[in-house]
């Protein structure tokens, strides 16, 4: 499937989703060029955004380095680096210095497919009953989104 077709289908999917969810937080492939160049295609599958009654566009957020909620995204950066450089021996302090560079940090974050199962935000702790109910209600849309991108992605829960 071409990039243009994926983007078109993604827009239609999120338009449909917005009819059901007022504060929908869109996600997906952050940057197609960076994603297509990455050695391993990674899909980061998370529960929900930490954003109550707020719309967070994760493509914008991650394309700009994800400087809000820094501890979460620094862990993600470590995972990405480790997965993309699995054959390399590296020193932990070198990795920390590497991601202090804004350009490198942003490039790594742009290389992923990011998907929250619950497309509306919650607090820093998930209400499991609410999460489960919404995932059941949105099951078909979640499956449609994953099928839109899925090829040989590695899914990291």
Task: Give, region by region, the residue ranges found by the protein language model.
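Active-site and ligand/interface coordination hotspots across diverse enzymes
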Residues: 1-85, 101
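Internal alpha/beta domain cores that form substrate/cofactor-binding pockets in large enzymes
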Residues: 41-43, 83-149
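Long, contiguous hydrophobic alpha-helical segments, chiefly transmembrane helices and signal peptides
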Residues: 76, 114-115, 157
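Alpha-helical hinge/cap motifs
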Residues: 150-157
């Amino acid at each position: 499937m071409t990039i243009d077709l994926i983007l078109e289908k993604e827009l239609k999917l999120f338009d449909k989703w917005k009819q059901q969810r007022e504060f929908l937080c869109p996600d997906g492939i952050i940057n197609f060029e960076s994603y297509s160049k990455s050695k391993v295609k990674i899909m980061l599958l998370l529960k929900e955004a930490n954003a109550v009654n707020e719309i967070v566009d994760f493509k914008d957020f991650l394309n700009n380095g994800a400087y809000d909620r820094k501890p979460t995204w620094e862990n993600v950066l470590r995972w990405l680096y480790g997965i993309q450089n699995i054959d390399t021996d590296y020193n932990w302090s070198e990795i920390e210095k590497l991601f202090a560079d804004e350009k490198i940090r942003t490039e790594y974050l742009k290389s992923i497919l990011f998907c929250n199962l619950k497309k509306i935000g919650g607090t820093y702790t998930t209400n499991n009953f609410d999460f489960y109910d919404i995932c059941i209600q949105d099951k078909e849309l979640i499956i449609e989104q994953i099928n839109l991108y899925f090829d040989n992605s590695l899914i990291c829960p």
